[in-house]
Amino acid sequence: MATHAEEIVLVNTNILNVNMSNVTKLTSTNYLMWSRQVHALFDGYELAGFLDGSTPMPPATIGTDAVPRVNPDYTRWRRQDKLIYSAILGAISMSVQPAVSRATTAAQIWETLRKIYANPSYGHVTQLRFITRFDQLALLGKPMDHDEQVERVLENLPDDYKPVIDQIAAKDTPPSLTEIHERLINRESKLLALNSAEVVPITANVVTHRNTNTNRNQNNRGDNRNYNNNNNRSNSWQPSSSGSRSDNRQPKPYLGRCQICSVQGHSAKRCPQLHQFQSTTNQQQSTSPFTPWQPRANLAVNSPYNANNWLLDSGATHHITSDFNNLSFHQPYTGGDDVMIADGSTIPITHTGSASLPTSSRSLDLNKVLYVPNIHKNLISVYRLCNTNRVSVEFFPASFQVKDLNTGVPLLQGKTKDELYEWPIASSQAVSMFASPCSKATHSSWHSRLGHPSLAILNSVISNHSLPVLNPSHKLLSCSDCFINKSHKVPFSNSTITSSKPLEYIYSDVWSSPILSIDNYRYYVIFVDHFTRYTWLYPLKQKSQVKDTFIIFKSLVENRFQTRIGTLYSDNGGEFVVLRDYLSQHGISHFTSPPHTPEHNGLSERKHRHIVEMGLTLLSHASVPKTYWPYAFSVAVYLINRLPTPLLQLQSPFQKLFGQPPNYEKLKVFGCACYPWLRPYNRHKLEDKSKQCAFMGYSLTQSAYLCLHIPTGRLYTSRHVQFDERCFPFSTTNFGVSTSQEQRSDSAPNWPSHTTLPTTPLVLPAPPCLGPHLDTSPRPPSSPSPLCTTQVSSSNLPSSSISSPSSSEPTAPSHNGPQPTAQPHQTQNSNSNSPILNNPNPNSPSPNSPNQNSPLPQSPISSPHIPTPSTSISEPNSPSSSSTSTPPLPPVLPAPPIIQVNAQAPVNTHSMATRAKDGIRKPNQKYSYATSLAANSEPRTAIQAMKDDRWRQAMGSEINAQIGNHTWDLVPPPPPSVTIVGCRWIFTKKFNSDGSLNRYKARLVAKGYNQRPGLDYAETFSPVIKSTSIRIVLGVAVDRSWPIRQLDVNNAFLQGTLTDEVYMSQPPGFVDKDRPDYVCRLRKAIYGLKQAPRAWYVELRTYLLTVGFVNSISDTSLFVLQRGRSIIYMLVYVDDILITGNDTVLLKHTLDALSQRFSVKEHEDLHYFLGIEAKRVPQGLHLSQRRYTLDLLARTNMLTAKPVATPMATSPKLTLHSGTKLPDPTEYRGIVGSLQYLAFTRPDLSYAVNRLSQYMHMPTDDHWNALKRVLRYLAGTPDHGIFLKKGNTLSLHAYSDADWAGDTDDYVSTNGYIVYLGHHPISWSSKKQKGVVRSSTEAEYRSVANTSSELQWICSLLTELGIQLSHPPVIYCDNVGATYLCANPVFHSRMKHIALDYHFIRNQVQSGALRVVHVSTHDQLADTLTKPLSRVAFQNFSRKIGVIKVPPSCGGVLRI
């Protein structure tokens, strides 16, 4: 007879991978179309049965033998179903995928979607009914406003949908009908789930149910039966029907023992002692009817109780224990069920947990064990034992046997005891079954040892590894350190990338620390293996070290695991971009996340969060200063690699990678007190054999611990260490501020700096016997070996534990990279040339002086102590000078020396906890960039600046440049009639595009506002390139793949020679002591002078013309060099220069010539120019002002403002006198001015800026609110900009539009245009016309005239650039009348007042230099430059204009 498994045959025996790339993604509105498309596709592959269930799942096993065989049809069915499951998920949008998160098969997904979207539910009917009505009104010419549509939909909803109504009403702008429909569907699904939910409590230990109307045999033991995880016998109890059953058979006599009175011959239900429970039972059944799902168990006999005795129960569905110590992992029971015993009474369940049973070869796990205090036997559910551990149990009359289900090898054999099957436990195993024989620790101690993991992970480790726990009945107390340091946002969804072996996918990212570490580390880079989740961490001092670090990492892991790295996944940071050539040469794929989208690299981001949270918790728990974060983070990664994770089925990454469990017994609490054996380091026999140190981590190249001696800063690596995990040395030490360069303070700490971290990865273990290890531990001066084989006695420290790291766990392999040398650090000598930097007591010893016998290097930076500044500035002495020439002022030292800490320096000893004691600063707010944070830290005067050696060095560099350029001569003061211009210092911190600090800059500027025109200066001019010229040249360079170099001329204004006689006072802080009344007669221009920009331009222009450049007529700041077919473009914006060209040799020659003539700082490529971030990708160049936008938002406290979709609201319209006048318009004017500069890369802001600029003379609160809306729009789009696409066609066209009488104050029209060179937006404008016009045609006509003027100028510029257009420019206008006027020679009296515009355009059109073409209003891109638009229209036009967030990642086309 054929079995059921043989009857089910798959229709298609081939495994097919369905291509669903052409299937439209499922949304909440297109289910019917989507389902037909998907069903037809799978029907074509003959796989539709997997969707509708007609192809059922075959049985997992087949055969009638004792050991079943795997069913090949089941394996084939499961593989095909998973492929279909994945394909369907890929065809579902992200908003719909949560609805099918519980489905495990393709058929379940299909049925779930059908129930949600195919039923004629209230949400679907409501949507269709209202959308149909709205469409009918629109067809009748009476369209309903969107706000009214939303109101009509919401007012017809029942009370069950009130939460949705409240959420929509709380929004500033009403959502779309599609979004409302999605919310109604979600709410409807929740209501259906609440109405149809069935509560099914757990079942446990089904043994008996007392019922006088049944003859069921209650003895479930003693038969010779086989049980394994494949039997189909139901273990659930089925209640008997009410009433008596008719059974004519003679009942057999009962041969077992009663479970109540222990007398043989009758069962428990016929026991005489049972009658005393009858009344109680009947009363309980009448008030609380019995449910078949209630947990039940046998009533234990009154035999001697042994908590370690376990009985096998073939009818039980849950394990039960009455001894809490049997549970290694436990948690309170939250269900509402009790265990019912044979007499009908119930026993409460208080906890659930896990346990394990030992066998000859492996332990068997008992999961979901119920802790019932009042039961007297421990019961093992045979069903759960077999299914959990993949074993089978064979019962015999006097014994039983447990076998491995896969191999059939016997694991354990037991005998019956008192006619019960009792699990055999030897006396020596009775204690070790559930607890370790070593010393026990509390849950809190294990929580600290393991790096403060979550409660689930902690319990999993304790359970699976049988760790010794003291007082297991106590719950884990709340950990304040975890609450403080592990607060986080809601996680993102998991990635769909799968891997099948180690190193197939390596995820990497760089983390930046706001605090410079004690070893001068600012960053760390991680490499995470996707398959095992194993993590490697390398500390970095600069991001540029990532490439070399990856090369070392690649060699290390590929050699260790004998496999190659397949794919590196990272972000688009410059530190990873430079790896592309190396990766391609070695056959490694490089996947990158889209710019500013860290969620796509979620594995690395989550790993960062895990590492940082655990590291900060370790620091906080041990009161360790945050400057030690590399040590804490390395320990955190060390522990993370050894902690089980649900992603690996509660395996640890270490075990997944190396195939063996980690050793947890060597773990100690980070930062606790430790006492290493230091006898080999002593100079004489009377020195202490040990010192109190702080435990800082685990050695990865040796089987040893890292111990930091805080007073001396020495880091010992020792195997023989005693630990006191209750004491933390850092918590009892008073610290000053951090010794990092970024956090110096006037108060000096009383503790020295420490050793640097090794350059090896901090978390790389590997199995032993891989070759010789490099020893980096400190070694004694005379001893040949730092380790001693004699065990240290711990008798004198009863409260401490002596520990030695186990050698059973793999250690790190040797590292081929550089290792730290064991040489003492040589302290820098202080220079006494500067009076400010002199040590007040140079002969006194410094407490930071390194120990000459120290085997470890000291920190290269000692703690600075800056003396208290005086009220006057100490001036450097000037050397003697001749009468004809003034010698240069003495420069400030370029590298200020390190000042040693005075031994008697005051130390903060008060008890108040401050951030300064921990060496930290207040955390930055969201998007808080360095410029906004450092705005108040920039000195205002020279007196303030001279207190800081960094500003003092910057001032010295500026003075050196002035002296080297011979900018002035020191002369006696001129007659009183001659103006003496003052001067002052301007201090600025220069930042990179990512907000990181670049350098400190001090600029000496003249007070040019004191100059008088005609006397002190004649003409002024500043070389400023037009923004349109910049965009045109960059577009041409990108299209032709030319290199673009960025130059910065150092002290550019100092290059210009003055023709006027100008006198300036001596620089503050650098006054000649011998001639303090002298003044500086300027020879060269200096910043701040009215004529300085013009003098610099004349100097630069003269030089460029001599070397062959031609000055452009259209833009005087543009220079063109052409030699044969080679051409070079140079754009000048004051002292910033862009240069590009088609000949790299000529380009390099030009750059070298400029560097020889001027002091030029050259950048490798364009990246940050005039506050514009330029990101070049293979598809083109993206220009944005992200950092400038964020700085503006930070300055106005709008970083956390709620974003809006449009910069201006469509209603109400702004008027001149609406609202209340602002008392102080300064801030309003400043923000509008900033927005004007921001419009350089944001044409979507042009109209808003133009509109708000009209009220700068008298702004009101209405205008201020409109300005704040623009800032809110920027808060949601800080990284938007224009994209110059490669492969562009150089055709010129423009869109022109006008808003006729749009200003209700004076009824003047607003015209706007946007000009394109191919797909590149190169010029745009939004401004009011000069006067009132009488028709829309006239307004549009004047706008076309203005646009044609701009096109004519652009054509002239293109001609000078050597670019010839193949077709005349085209202007697109949406006004038919204006288009006809341009094309037809018509003129009459009504057009007299626009005759000039008419003749100008007519000549352009008739000569063929211009064409005017009509375009539909829906395609008029300039519409967004003349009036506020709705959200949908604005976003549509912004996208068409070319304002995007990031450049296309895979060659996407920018559609216009």
Swiss-Prot record:
Molecular function terms, GO-annotated: aspartic-type endopeptidase activity; endonuclease activity; nucleic acid binding; RNA-directed DNA polymerase activity; zinc ion binding
Feature: compositional bias, Pro residues: 887-896
A Pfam family annotated for this UniProt entry: rve
Keywords on record: Aspartyl protease, DNA integration, DNA recombination, Endonuclease, Hydrolase, Magnesium, Metal-binding, Nuclease, Protease, Transferase, Zinc, Zinc-finger
Keyword rRNA processing: no
Xref: InterPro entries: DNA/RNA_pol_sf, GAG-pre-integrase_dom, Integrase_cat-core, PolX-like_BBD, RNaseH-like_sf, RNaseH_sf, RVT_2
Residue ranges with Polar residues bias: 738-754, 816-827
Protein name (database record): Retrovirus-related Pol polyprotein from transposon RE2
Organism: Arabidopsis thaliana
Gene that encodes it: RE2
